[in-house]
Amino acid sequence: MSGSTITPWVVGNWKMNPMRANANQLIEEFKQLLQQNQIADENCHVGVAPVSIALTTVQAQLQDAARTVYTVAQDVSRVAGTGAYTGEVSAELLKDSQINFVLVGHSERRDIFGDNVEILKAKLQNALNAGMTVIYCVGESLEQREQGQAEQVVLQQICDIAPVVTAEQWQNQVVIAYEPIWAIGTGKTASPQDAQAMHAKIREGLCQLTPAGSNIAILYGGSVKAENAVELAACPDINGALVGGASLNAASFYQIVQAFAQSK
């Protein structure tokens, strides 16, 4: 079942970049592009995910943008509330700062920092219960793809979280981002045909898990660039993009937003 009627999302994941002066300049340049070439809110949801210490600064900078641009946290604690947890930022603390969106399950969190299924379920559940919208990342390694396990791995990652997501949360608070691990930061991109095939399988799996399955946005994240955005955006089950390196250039990021806003 196609998700072509879903309003697309484009989210820029800045990762551990850039320095403050460059971040300020990046936001101002992006705002100027939005002012000159406005894209209606209803045509595309747009977000940026800066480092945690810049969340409220970026949020304040975006207040006078020509359209809504959400500020997205890159991660959240597996511990809820407040307490003696040095270095942690809970979903409740994010919400208290009016940060309503968060990434959970990015492959760099899984691979570098050891976020396993139980940790990710706790992070997801805390964020959802705090009222946040979660962009939940799934994806396979090159080895898993070459062994023919890509679909099995990705669908299992989604099934793993099903016990902690309510029907209402699936409907209103969950976005899925498919990020083939082998395409992140490598310059390699799944062909639009391969990406669409995986997105269609994810859509099928979501529809089996929840009645909301046909309404959940599925983003593609794997070296999305201005040069390939139009072709990716034309795929019926690709409902947006989780953009890495290209989001650190205002013009490139704007072109990706424009591609998805004009595609649906």
Swiss-Prot record:
CDD domains: TIM. HAMAP family: TIM_B. Substrate binds at residues 13-15, 185, 223, 244-245. InterPro entries: Aldolase_TIM, TIM_sf, TrioseP_Isoase_bac/euk, Triosephosphate_isomerase, Triosephosphate_isomerase_AS. Belongs to the triosephosphate isomerase family. The keyword Isomerase applies. The lineage of its organism: Bacteria, Pseudomonadati, Pseudomonadota, Gammaproteobacteria, Moraxellales. Pathway: Carbohydrate biosynthesis; gluconeogenesis; Carbohydrate degradation; glycolysis; D-glyceraldehyde 3-phosphate from glycerone phosphate: step 1/1. PANTHER family: TRIOSEPHOSPHATE ISOMERASE. The active site is at residues 106, 179. Involved in the gluconeogenesis. Catalyzes stereospecifically the conversion of dihydroxyacetone phosphate (DHAP) to D-glyceraldehyde-3-phosphate (G3P). Keywords: Cytoplasm, Gluconeogenesis, Glycolysis, Isomerase. Its main location: cytoplasm. GO terms for biological process: gluconeogenesis; glyceraldehyde-3-phosphate biosynthetic process; glycerol catabolic process; glycolytic process. It is found in: Cytoplasm. Gene3D superfamilies: Aldolase class I. It is an enzyme of class 5 (isomerase). SUPFAM superfamilies: Triosephosphate isomerase (TIM). NCBIfam families: tim (TIGR00419). GO terms for cellular component: cytosol. GO terms for molecular function: triose-phosphate isomerase activity. Its EC number is 5.3.1.1. The keyword Isomerase applies. This is Triosephosphate isomerase. Homodimer.
